[in-house]
Design a protein with these regions (language model features):
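Active-site metal-binding loops of divalent metal-dependent hydrolases
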Residues: 17, 57-59, 102, 123-124, ...
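Metallo-beta-lactamase
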Residues: 2-4, 75-89, 93, 123-180, ...
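Cap/insert and terminal regions of metallo-dependent hydrolase folds
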Residues: 73-82, 198-281
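Active-site metal-binding motif and surrounding structural segment of the metallo-beta-lactamase
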Residues: 70-120
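Core dinuclear metal-dependent hydrolase active-site scaffold
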Residues: 13, 43-47, 164-197
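Zn-dependent metallo-beta-lactamase
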Residues: 1-55, 59-63, 67-70, 168, ...
């Protein structure tokens, strides 16, 4: 971890939406006897004096985003831009966006940040284009993909604001690192490691884990559990989970899981607006 202040960040977990009654089996493979849970949707802000970085962006509830929100049972939503404004961040202030993967709830508002450079794994973007070109009978693969988000990524490429990554990158930005989790949740999912002054390196899991139970096993019994939904293999899912755990020496207080309410027990609540929370890591 760097000791340079420009290479460490203040990190915030920003909740912007919730779905109701999600089957636990869709989060934890094979766990059919635990009923349903409500699910938070979140993204991360990492900032210092030099940079304002988003790790994922959430989605806008209009057009195709509204249709996907209805499809996936999003019962409550507030604009990610409004959530950022609560922390004093304007869209034009965002310098960089690191995308963990291309699902609608993670890159659904990239067009709202006109000055930001975008970073995504090359295989993630290109293989989604391949998947979109398959016959409609393969629609399971693209169920959580918004084609308009892919179009917006290509528009960013036209403006020379898109960087396609090929594998792991240390110091993608000073103090921000990415690790490829290929063929796990998605074709080119990645998790992000952010250096902080207080906690040291912190992992933003993206959807390499849906729940802390993916990391700890049911009731903390210690056996990794693959995700209940993905386009890759269970084996790869477990390998990525293990990488994340080793990254933080099994310290769960240094892993941010974006779809688990349990994280509010690990991080200090900075503010709460109409039930939506922002935590400082």
């Amino acid at each position: 971890m760097s000791t340079d202040p420009s290479a460490t960040y203040d990190v915030y977990v920003i909740e912007y939406a919730r779905s109701r009654n999600q089957p636990v089996a869709s989060l934890l493979l094979g766990v059919y006897d635990r009923g349903t849970v409500d699910l938070p949707f979140s993204f991360v802000l990492a900032r210092n004096a030099e940079r304002t970085v988003l790790i994922d962006t959430g989605f806008m509830r209009d057009g195709s985003g509204a249709a996907l929100a209805e499809k996936f049972g999003i019962a409550a939503w507030v604009s990610p831009l409004e959530r950022l404004a609560a922390l004093g961040v304007r869209p034009e202030d965002v310098t960089d966006i690191v995308l963990t993967h291309a699902h609608y709830d993670h890159m659904g508002s990239i067009d709202r940040f006109p000055n930001a450079r975008l970073f995504i794994q090359k295989r993630e973007l290109l293989q989604w284009i391949e998947a979109m070109a398959l016959p409609a009978r393969f629609g399971f693969l693209t169920a959580a993909l918004d084609a308009e988000d892919v179009h917006e990524a290509l528009r960013a490429a036209e403006e020379h604001r898109l960087t396609l990554l090929e594998g792991d990158r240390r110091d993608l930005l000073p103090g921000i690192h990415v690790v490829l989790g290929a063929d796990s949740h998605t074709f080119g999912s990645q998790y992000v490691v952010v250096d902080t002054a207080v906690r040291g390196p912190v992992v933003v899991a993206g959807d390499c884990a849906y729940s802390y139970a993916n990391l700890t096993g049911l009731d903390g019994q210690g056996t990794y559990i693959p995700l209940g939904f993905g386009v890759g293999s269970h084996y790869q899912s477990l390998m990525v989970i293990d990488k994340m755990m080793r990254e933080v020496d099994d310290d769960l207080s240094r892993i941010i899981v974006l779809h688990d309410f349990e994280r509010w027990e690990r991080f200090a609540i900075e503010r709460e607006d109409d039930g939506f929370r922002i935590a400082r890591v």
